[in-house]
Amino acid sequence: MSLTINHQTNDISNSTGTITINGVAVGGDNTPIIWSGNRGLFGGGDTGSASNVIDYVTIATTGNATDFGDLTVARHSPAACSDGIYGLFGGGFIPADPTGSATNVIDYVTIATLANATDFGDLTVAQYGPAACSNGTYGLFGGGLDGSAINVINYVTIATTGNATDFGDLTAARYGLAACSNGTYGLFGGGWGGSNSNIIDYVTISTTGNATDFGDLTAARRFLASCSDVTYGIFGGGNTGSNSNIIDYVTISTTGNATDFGDLTVVKYGPAACSDLTYGIFGGGSTSNVIDYVTIATPANATDFGDLTVARTSPAACSGD
């Protein structure tokens, strides 16, 4: 069996899991796995009040974000993932008198088309501050707060609107965590479950079941963000007791503790992150409009990318084409 990518034919007859050919992740069924793309979207957040703003950037080109459209309901602390075509924004917190509430709303957009979001379906439970990742087919939403921290993982088929289904449980209940994937494994790191957590869990995205311990972040923290390429997952920002500019990384296919990657340009509580599988961008956080970027395969400090259209804390981000 062979597969041609970028005009190069490659023998993959003996491949299992995810392999990489010319920067493209390829699954065991010999098809490209796409969970990201060139356009990065940032949706929702807290500007002092809840925001419904979605803005976008071209990840390979530094510059300020442009308006994309609006979420169906203004909220902060949702989570987002994509299949490279559709972007989903699920969960979050809708402030309202007197205390507000977590939500189970899932919205979707077609990433290539500027427009307002449309209702997709509902999570199995309301989730404030969940994290999300994808393998290009299934989108997982894990953790969150619904009165108390929860360990629930839900999943949806991204290309098919409908309500989420139970996937399994995280190893520890927490919210304000972050997630990424390499197209096969999904990692959920950090969060708050009564104290800051350094836990990294992992799941095989195509197989329902409970998460397994992966290792530890370099610093326990909450409301951080994560993105990845096909090899490395990076976790940036968050609150360790004070707001942080920490970036650490792991090799997603190899369990173990995270290693220092570098620093964001500014401390960020509640940023959001996405990637084009080469560059990772971290936008917003600490009611800032700053977007930073890194080259995911090269540990180093982040560089200024540009600005969001609206400064805000705890948006969610995904990417596609």
What are these regions (language model features)?
Residues S2-T4, N10-D321:
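Polar, enzyme-active/binding microenvironments
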